[in-house]
Amino acid sequence: MLTTFWLRLGSWLGKLLLIAITLGLLGWALASGWFAWQHRGPVAAQEQIPAGEAAMTQETIQTAIKIVDQHRENTRYLRDAHAKAHGCVKAQVQVLDDLDPALRQGVFATPGHTWQAVMRLSNGNAYPQFDSIRDARGMALKLQDVPGTQLLPSQQGRGEQDFVMFNHPNFFVSDVAEYRQNIAAQADGKKVLAFFPSWDTRSWQVRHLFIALATLAPAPVSPAQTTYFSVSPYKFGSANAKYRVAPDPDSCPAYTLAEQNQALPNFLRNALNQQLSTDRVPACFVLQIQRQNANRFMPIEDTSIQWQESDAPFETVARVKVPAQDFDTPAQNLACDNLSFSPWHSIEEHRPIGGINRLRKAVYDAVSQYRHTRNAEQ
């Protein structure tokens, strides 16, 4: 009798499990189909500014400054994001000698030309934490002595072209409205509300939560062995494009980094120092662009959407070399902290576009001014 009961219970549970799996697969198929239907081309090739964006931008500025105040370290005011640098290093960006004429735009207009640059490598968090903690990793590249009119009036005469990137191809927010909500939740210490702002399931951003979790990846072996993406789009002459900087070990001497002690708080800085300063081995990258195909789902205004390489491949426009150097000194680290990077430190040919870049224009400038003013008062 007892044996019969357990057999029937096992049979019933097996059927229930099969039904659950079937329903799960059906739900996944329906969700995938709906997502594919919603996210199909063509898309706009021009910016589309939603109503209320300016007001939301002002709210975001105040929240970003609040975060700067919260994460003040000792007597210095840090960035509201990517506060901890692994170092600022000198670099050279050489345009390909045989660059396709269609790709000769802006700072890439002259084949073979070499730009002197500064590269800042960083963790993504607003608070300096151990490198072993899961986090985004950033690269900012500042080309120097770039001729032409700068987009920002305050930048005239500085001759800079910045590329700002981090190590994931898409962002965990779509637009300014979502960014305002996300950063406000983080500033209030209520991170769960960043993706689940209310009990209304229609407001839940589960897909964006998974993007955020993927962004908070385990630490790389070295900042020099990581691929970085612009996430947001830019003009590339008359085209729209995203950028990527990827390691290019074939262009540098063969090198195997000694195993680092990842229990140390700054092991990524140590790894960079080991390669460039101790072993005197350069690091090499390629700088690539991905041009928008407006007939495919490659939107300008939604940074949570990854532009698929099957729709538009990345094309190499330049090689980036970080020569062997000494960079980890108190004076150089202070100079690194005082540097400002922004997508809007740019010439017209590489104008930032899309909502997140419009937001950056105001927020980066306001936070930079606030931070440098407060630090100058110390």
Regions found by a protein language model. Give the residues of each.
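Active-site-adjacent core segments of small-molecule enzymes
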Residues: A29-Q378
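N-terminal Sec-pathway targeting helices
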Residues: T4-L25
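Short, aromatic- and cysteine-enriched interfacial helices/patches
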Residues: M1-L2, W37
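Generic low-polarity alpha-helical segments
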Residues: M1, L13, F285-I289
